[in-house]
Amino acid sequence: MSAVTSDYTPQRVVCLQPSATVILAALGRLDRVVACTKYCADVCPEVKSGGRSIIADSWTAQSRQILAARPDLVIAAVPYQEKAVVEILKAGVRFLGLAPKTLADIYCDIATIAGAVGASQRGQTVIANMQQEIEKVRKRVKGRRRLRVYCEEWGKPLIASQRWVAELVEAAGGEFLGDPGAQSSAESILAMDPEVVVAAWCGAGDRVPLEKIVRDRKWQPMSAIREGRVYCISDELLNTPAPTLVRGLQALAAAIHPGSFPQPERLRCISDTRVRTDAHRSD
């Protein structure tokens, strides 16, 4: 859904979608953002400065709160509150809705936002850089055995990561298990016997309780658990469809091929906790 015209360059943007904020930062157009949600600020801390309005979240925000920022463009994920969209459009404000499912969709979103804010050339550069970084990783893992990888974006219920994450897992040299974005059960995941488990829960950062989920789900017989290959990746690196996915890919590559890629800061392995616990007990 879009009401953006090609002959207009917005100067006051309200971001209700974190990925849009990250994309605008990559485009060098963060100065156009006059208001955003707290989740946008979480993934893009730079937006907290400059006196910008912080809206609680996109689903509880009222149109009057959004319009109070005097935007000429509102960017949100769709489907969105139908009533709010109608009121925004009635006020003469342009609305851009994002609903990416694949990496190709994300590239299109970057190009669309770049075009809307007068940064088309920069947008193409951002896209090209993403594609080049993904291809670098793909080439490094070419010919290696693909490990079975289970990635989830939520734990109760168990929901597999989105399709773009499945594409990143493949690029990192893994075999994505299950259906992207689908709900599953602990028993069905155990039956697939993943060799690597990655948890990136929405809104949890890198604080997923890995030991607890293994214990509660009775996954001890799983290959990934026996080998200590259970990881948490900060959710913004995988769940935010923006240029930062490249860092998520690097974390996935380190989880799948730890001997070939350095472990980034926002990748945590269940064995890391065990090492700290053992060291504490020996003191």
Segments predicted by a language model, with ranges:
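N-terminal ligand-binding lobe of clamshell/alpha-beta domains
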Residues: 1-283
